[in-house]
Design a protein with these regions (language model features):
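Bacterial N-terminal signal peptides
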Residues: 8-18
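Positively charged n-region of N-terminal signal peptides that target proteins for export
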Residues: 1-5
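Immediate post-signal-peptide N-terminus of mature secreted/exported proteins
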Residues: 22-64
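Non-catalytic accessory regions used for complex assembly or targeting
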Residues: 20-34, 162, 170-183
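Residues at structural and domain junctions
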Residues: 8, 25-28, 48, 92, ...
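Mature extracellular/secreted ectodomains of secretory-pathway proteins
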Residues: 54-175
């Protein structure tokens, strides 16, 4: 009887380990060249027309695709996306288009990784690409909805015009990169 319990316990442990290992396995094979091109085209379309409802199905595909593929991993750093001022603004009345811009920043980072596979480890360059992509989308939103202004996003556009956006991103991302290194 005792031997049966020990064997049962061991088998239970193995089954738990196999479930845990299965969760670490990729959901699918690496991305294909065709999928990457589709994703890049969508990212550029969304920079120009982030509110285009005809792109919503493609956007849903892109979100799921990024979750599933094992070969493109995007790092998210909330302070970098739009800055701590933007995050503070969100505590009051949230900016209407935050979800669109957040996804655009993520898509912009992934697009950078696809276009620059040799820079997969350069998180600052990835963050910068994401912010630049989101700022393009923000500018496009303002063309269709002039009331959709955000002081912090306007400040980022100004930093971009002055050539100071890269410094801002580098400084803002230090906390995120420090946390990654400490893991």
């Amino acid at each position: 009887m005792r031997k049966a319990r020990v064997i049962g316990f061991i088998l239970s442990c193995f089954s738990i380990l196999s479930v845990c290992a299965a969760q670490d396995e990729p959901k699918r094979a690496p991305s294909t060249a065709q999928e990457r091109q589709r994703f890049l085209a969508l990212t550029r379309k969304l920079e120009q027309a982030p509110l285009d409802k005809t792109l919503y199905d493609e956007k849903a595909w892109a979100k799921q695709w990024l979750e599933d593929i094992p070969d493109i991993n995007v790092n998210i750093c909330a302070p970098v996306l739009f800055g701590t001022d933007f995050l503070r603004e969100q505590a009051g009345e949230p900016y209407k288009y935050t979800p669109q811009l957040s996804y655009q920043a993520t898509f912009g980072e992934a697009a950078y990784i696809i276009e620059h596979p040799d820079k997969k480890g350069d998180t600052t360059a990835q963050y910068l690409a994401g912010v630049e992509s989101a700022l393009k989308a923000y500018s496009a939103i303002l063309k269709s909805d002039a009331t959709a202004k955000s002081k912090s996003l306007d400040d980022l556009l100004e930093k971009q015009k002055q050539g100071k956006l890269a410094d801002f991103v580098r400084d803002s991302s230090k906390d995120c990169d420090d946390k990654k290194e400490g893991m």
